[in-house]
């Protein structure tokens, strides 16, 4: 849908250069990248994993005003699928539900583009954004608001010949507010465009339609039909040390996840401190959950692939490295139709490490 990478090859070249040998693709509502991921991993002797991500809605949590893993929207819950089958096996009713939710997600961004063009016309920007061209040039079929931000930044670059002219044009587009980002920092400029125009309160903001969010149970069913493991992504501690309503009581969160049928959880390690990650992952492993880690690349900023924590740029602690590998073994085993972490370890040792 959107990433900092120019293409799959760049992402995997970075992984190989950083000595990351087990690599997973993860995209919103899409498995379209699986073939290229598989083939390019093979060319670099990397082990591919196949994942997917959804935004779901839990009506019970929404009614209770409970923030789960979206800190701003009670009941809205991000879910991942780990170790999906490749070649893709999803078909029938579940495949149609996935196609429908992806189409609605794209339609919401198309409505946003129309509103953005109305704003550009009102401020006499001198150009507009061609939605079909954005989809063709900047996406593989899944379009997000970040693509609109990138398209607008590129349009301003094309319309204004020098830095001073671009700054003046941004000030007009932003309703008299000057651009705060350095004009040469494309990633920062795109983030500012998104924040000022496309998010809530912005001139081109369009709220997401409830149709874009499937019930949690339906998402889990789609993931299982695709051969994957339904997985709950923990936010855990934010930069101020705060937790969401759902995650603050770890024991209660684990019990609720079990009742809802989850056996797998994941963390994006750069979001959290080492101490919190170790505490949460130790507890969740003891409770029988598969625990996996991942990196985050859904902004314009190009970040390393090798895992690290918020308070340790050098990498993971030895305890977290072992947790990470154990989780990778569990997912690799599932993906290969094997039945244990040990079998996954043997598979990875043989195929990745040549042991």
Per-segment meaning from a language model:
Residues 1-76, 192-226, 232-302, 311, ...:
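An N-terminally biased module of ancient metal coordination in phosphate/nucleic-acid-related enzymes
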Residues 36-42, 143-155, 176-190, 210-220:
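Short, charge-rich amphipathic segments
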Residues 65-95:
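A basic- and aromatic-enriched beta-loop-alpha substructure that forms the phosphate/nucleotide-
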Residues 87-172:
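Non-catalytic, alpha-helical, charged scaffold/linker segments
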Residues 305-307:
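Active-site-adjacent pocket scaffolds in enzyme catalytic domains
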Residues 164-205, 213:
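Long, low-complexity, polar/charged, intrinsically disordered or flexibly structured peripheral segments
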Residues 93, 147, 151, 165-169, ...:
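Exposed alpha-helical structural elements
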């Amino acid at each position: 849908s959107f990433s900092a990478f120019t293409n799959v090859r760049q992402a995997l070249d970075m992984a190989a250069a950083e000595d990351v040998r087990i690599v997973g693709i993860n995209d919103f509502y899409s498995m379209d990248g699986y073939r290229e991921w598989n083939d390019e991993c093979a060319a670099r002797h990397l082990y591919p994993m196949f994942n997917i991500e959804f935004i779901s809605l839990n009506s019970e949590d929404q009614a209770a005003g409970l923030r789960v893993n979206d800190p701003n929207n009670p009941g809205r819950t991000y879910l991942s699928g780990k170790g999906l089958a490749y070649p893709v096996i999803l078909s029938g009713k579940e495949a149609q539900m996935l196609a429908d939710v992806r189409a609605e997600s794209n339609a919401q961004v198309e409505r946003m583009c129309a509103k953005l063009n109305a704003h550009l016309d009102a401020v006499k920007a001198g150009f507009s954004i061609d939605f079909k061209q954005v989809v063709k040039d900047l996406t593989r079929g899944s379009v997000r608001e970040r693509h609109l931000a990138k398209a607008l930044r590129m349009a301003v670059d094309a319309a204004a010949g020098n830095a001073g002219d671009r700054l003046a044009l941004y000030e007009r587009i932003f309703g008299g507010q000057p651009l705060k980002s350095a004009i040469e920092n494309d990633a920062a400029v795109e983030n500012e465009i998104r924040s000022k125009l496309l998010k809530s309160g912005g001139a081109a903001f369009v709220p997401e339609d409830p149709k874009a969010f499937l019930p949690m149970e339906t998402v889990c069913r789609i993931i299982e039909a695709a051969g994957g493991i339904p997985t709950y992504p923990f936010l855990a501690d934010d930069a101020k040390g705060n937790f969401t309503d759902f995650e603050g009581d770890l024991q209660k969160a684990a019990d609720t996840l079990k009742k809802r049928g989850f056996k797998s959880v994941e963390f994006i390690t750069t979001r959290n401190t080492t101490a919190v990650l170790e505490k949460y992952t130790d507890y969740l492993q003891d409770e029988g959950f598969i625990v996996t880690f991942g990196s985050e690349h859904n902004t314009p900023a190009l970040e390393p692939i090798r895992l690290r924590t918020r308070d340790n740029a050098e990498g993971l602690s030895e305890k977290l490295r072992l947790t990470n590998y154990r989780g990778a073994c569990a997912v690799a085993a599932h993906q290969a139709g094997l039945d244990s972490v040990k079998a996954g370890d043997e598979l990875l040792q043989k195929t990745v490490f040549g042991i």
